């Protein structure tokens, strides 16, 4: 069985954050959030990671160069023009095609199981251990065997604005039944709520709702499925919302679950999630990292020179 690799989804400039938030240091040693993810990933057993090539120079300077002696690094393009024959990129569109397309862009670099994370989210040590162990112990049989790390909604919202989250429903076996992408969730009057109509109406969500933070574990089979589904997505998306439609990775997983062709084990995380959606979130992350170091979960310098 091939060793699992790690795919890091790094978007471009953070539209809500204002700048390349993935390479903004979160401690006095100059580490960025991704350093902590890679440290946890290596500790769990990962030996290779893949990241977008567009920001290669910035990432090499921030992470790649110091990581090269600890882990193998591959850079891949997520090219907006890389779409199936018969389709055209709408004139003026600059927005990438979304998480499904980002993972599909890595197809030539992946030859076995892999995990997927966001570059700018702190997932915690247990999450990497759980996903690595799952991928090392499970293979496809009569169904695709995938996994996802689940977080409590209350641990994943910010005080500084709205966030997008995948809301999860599970069965008695702790497997994912479906996942619904809510693109605008925020704290309102002491409760957590979402809107689907630009704030005209709001619906409350329980604090202990399980959500996806885009930490997935897959066998290589998902790449074939992403490739097969992409034309269908484009047909619909380019008609309904040509400038902004996104090919969401969880939507493809949901389709496979509904068709009973895959299972996705939900691995509950004991770790609190931290992330920087807005500039105002940064002090919270800095304080959290400081406390995690105090508790002995991380050394002061992650990568000893």
Question: What kind of feature is each model-predicted range?
Answer:
Residues 58-59, 126, 225, 252, ...:
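Phosphate- and divalent-cation-binding pockets in alpha/beta enzyme and binding domains
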Residues 217, 264-267, 275:
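Conserved active-site beta-strand element of glycosyltransferases/polysaccharide synthases
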Residues 226-261:
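A C-terminal functional module that forms or caps the active site or interfaces directly
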Residues 23, 168-170, 266:
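A structural signal for short hydrophobic beta-strand segments in well-ordered beta-sheet cores
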Residues 125-213, 220:
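Conserved core of the sugar-phosphate nucleotidyltransferase
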Residues 1-11, 31-116, 123-128, 136-137:
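Conserved N-terminal catalytic core of the sugar/cofactor nucleotidyltransferase
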Residues 13, 120-121, 153:
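Active-site metal-binding loops of divalent metal-dependent hydrolases
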């Amino acid at each position: 069985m091939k060793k699992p690799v790690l795919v890091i989804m790094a978007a471009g400039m953070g539209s809500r954050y204002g700048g390349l938030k993935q390479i903004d240091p979160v401690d006095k040693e100059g580490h960025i959030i991704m350093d902590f993810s890679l440290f946890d990933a290596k500790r769990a057993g990962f030996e290779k990671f893949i990241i977008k090539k567009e920001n290669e120079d910035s990432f090499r300077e921030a992470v790649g160069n110091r990581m090269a002696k600890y882990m193998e690094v591959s850079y891949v393009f997520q090219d907006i023009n890389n779409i199936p024959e018969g389709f055209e990129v709408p004139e003026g569109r600059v927005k990438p095609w979304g998480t499904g397309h980002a993972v599909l862009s890595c197809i030539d670099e992946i030859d076995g199981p892999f995990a997927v994370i966001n570059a700018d989210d702190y997932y915690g040590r247990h999450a990497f251990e759980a996903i690595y162990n799952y991928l090392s112990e499970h293979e496809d049989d009569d169904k695709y065997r995938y996994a996802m790390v689940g977080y409590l909604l209350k641990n994943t919202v910010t005080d500084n604005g709205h966030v997008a989250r995948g809301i999860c429903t599970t069965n008695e076996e702790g497997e994912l039944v479906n996942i619904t992408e809510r693109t605008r969730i925020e704290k309102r009057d002491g409760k957590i709520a979402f809107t689907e109509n630009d704030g005209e109406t709001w619906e409350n969500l329980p604090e202990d709702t399980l959500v996806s933070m885009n930490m997935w574990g897959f066998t290589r089979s998902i790449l074939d499925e992403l490739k097969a589904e992409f034309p269908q997505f484009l047909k619909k998306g380019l008609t309904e919302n040509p400038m902004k439609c996104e090919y969401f990775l969880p939507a493809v997983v949901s389709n496979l679950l509904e068709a009973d062709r895959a299972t996705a084990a939900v691995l509950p995380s004991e770790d609190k999630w931290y992330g920087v959606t807005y500039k105002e979130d940064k002090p919270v992350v800095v304080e959290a990292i400081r406390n995690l170091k105090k508790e002995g979960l991380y050394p002061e310098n992650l990568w000893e020179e």
